[in-house]
């Protein structure tokens, strides 16, 4: 094989530099400088050159972020510097007592500063860089020994593979928090629910579980983020002298550092910061459960040192978790559209995080056995991550006499078929494809917002259609008549006409949405888009081999096998034929663009936040329009926000935008910006 010419080597350096700058701008600065299609083109060019000339591959190349599967176990390694946990304070009085303790140890210190940072609800990791290159990533573990997960760490785009320094220190260690943004957490749980799998209870568990995946490709698909918060410069005379300086140095090196930090001069300022974020944290795109307060001066930190468990110079000032006791009235099971049978605790209603909670998932029979939860038990429930209600524990001391352990049913409560628990799975399933619950779930999923988006066809109407024998499969929806629907309870001619129009309108939904609507196990909306981009028609996808499916970037073996198997089932082939006859879209159509080229729109490269209820557009529709026009939609208002799209009942985002002087748009103004001709 011929060696690479100087021109090829120069091109490789150029490509890496362009891709690294684009990645930094996108993931760290939140300010894209390159369109996705351009990034993908440059990435593929670099990948092709490295395939042809493997001697040019370097550890910091953008192509090396996602590697092959890890070995079947992680290697335990000692931390160079112990990764201590923090002492907790649950109110400002406990914080004041902590301050009194450290001041007694340093009576000569009269002037000091605190650095306040939000405590991110994720997993702590330690990164080692040598001569500017990432060489190791380790979990916290017990603080002394962690597990090396470097291939997984490399998939996190906000962690630089190479420091953005001309003359990097010989060796540094960076500590920080790997976490899942709320939107990504919800997307992952939606896909797990689609697949009939147990859901993650909260973003922290999801982040920890993701980091310990043996396949880096799965980690890459889950889009972890990373905030750096500690810097140790080893083997170098030039070291920062304060925590604040360290955070600024980390930013210079290319790390994402939480912008919501503050340098405080007094306990009163810490109090203000704590109270502010107790309210504002609900508007953040990630979960935070408190504030980390550190003494700023490193010399003072060194003077105070550590206890056996904690540093004396830092404390976690946490917000109280919302937990409450309630009584279990019943334990039932739900049968999902994939046949997954999920036990649910039905409880006396209780208020948590501003909502009334009376149901909590128990996930599967293993979790039921672990809790030993019984009807009549008093339990502690928590709005986990303020997202999913979960049963934390059973208070056995309050258990009534003569209660019986709960037994999972052996027959489906809907169709009475024998339930099975497939080998290697935690979930019990109904495998009867004619089960009414599976049909009901399939129809509701098909009509859902991210699938065919058939307005007016929710679960209640679906149940009416099934109970009256009008539909036996998804394809039957497209043969319904106005008079059939009008005869149903509480429908009438007007509602029936609206529903038929909505069903007919769904025939124009693109191939990616149709694919998602089919409900193939493990295929969520994002995966469906990946597949439809690579297989332009149902014929291409149904004839694809397992190998060609798995070779698609972002598609792992589990998804590939599920898709491959689904298209081999005769009933599914019949469903596809029937839907094709109903004129659904089973291929990617080339359309004349409705909107001007991205580069010519006023929204190109702009960041937009949406708040309130818009007059006609749904939030996901507005987001799609903005992104088609070259803009980017984020969840929270910051100094980087260009526009706030405002609807009715706008919340605190509007107040913050006004304080920052950010331009506001109405829906009408947005549509004129996107397409001035309309």
From Swiss-Prot:
GO terms for biological process: DNA repair; DNA replication. Its cofactor is Mg(2+); Mn(2+). Zn(2+) binds at residues 412, 415, 430, 435. Coiled coil: none annotated. One of its GO terms (molecular function) is metal ion binding. NAD(+) binds at residues 36-40, 85-86, 117, 140, 177, 294, 318. GO terms for cellular component: cytosol. Its EC number is 6.5.1.2. Residues 598-678 form the BRCT domain. PROSITE patterns: BRCT, DNA_LIGASE_N1. SMART domains: BRCT (SM00292), HhH1 (SM00278), LIGANc (SM00532). Keywords: DNA damage, DNA repair, DNA replication, Ligase, Magnesium, Manganese, Metal-binding, NAD, Zinc. It comes from the Bacteria. Belongs to the NAD-dependent DNA ligase family. LigA subfamily. DNA ligase that catalyzes the formation of phosphodiester linkages between 5'-phosphoryl and 3'-hydroxyl groups in double-stranded DNA using NAD as a coenzyme and as the energy source for the reaction. It is essential for DNA replication and repair of damaged DNA. This is DNA ligase.
